[in-house]
């Protein structure tokens, strides 16, 4: 399980996509990451109702902390690649993935 912190505005976009796909925000985020890094993962996706995500306020910005379930080796691949690039999941979503979507 990977703990991911993203901006509230990105979370809202992912939530809209999750509602459209009838799945959870974590499942949408997992699928985006796996597709971006071209990784196979057979973790099941479920629809979660009324999930209480942790909202963190830093100055004027709000962030949401999510739990993204995937195989441990895939989590390590993603974390190592992000560390190599000097990026966070939030930066990756904002600058590369969601701009092209």
From Swiss-Prot:
Protein name listed in UniProt: Uncharacterized protein 28
Pfam family, one: RHH_1
GO biological process: regulation of DNA-templated transcription
Domain of life: Viruses
InterPro entries (alphabetical): Arc_rbn_hlx_hlx, CopG
Lineage: Viruses, Adnaviria, Zilligvirae, Taleaviricota, Tokiviricetes
């Amino acid at each position: 399980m990977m703990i991911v912190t993203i901006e509230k505005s990105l979370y809202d976009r992912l939530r809209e996509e999750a509602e459209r796909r009838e799945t959870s925000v974590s499942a949408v985020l997992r699928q985006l990451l796996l597709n971006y890094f071209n990784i196979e993962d057979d973790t099941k996706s479920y629809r979660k109702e009324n999930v209480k995500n942790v909202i963190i306020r830093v100055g004027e910005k709000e962030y949401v902390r999510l739990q993204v379930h995937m195989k441990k080796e895939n989590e390590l691949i993603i974390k190592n690649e992000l560390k190599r690039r000097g990026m966070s999941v939030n930066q990756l979503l904002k600058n590369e993935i969601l701009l092209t979507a």
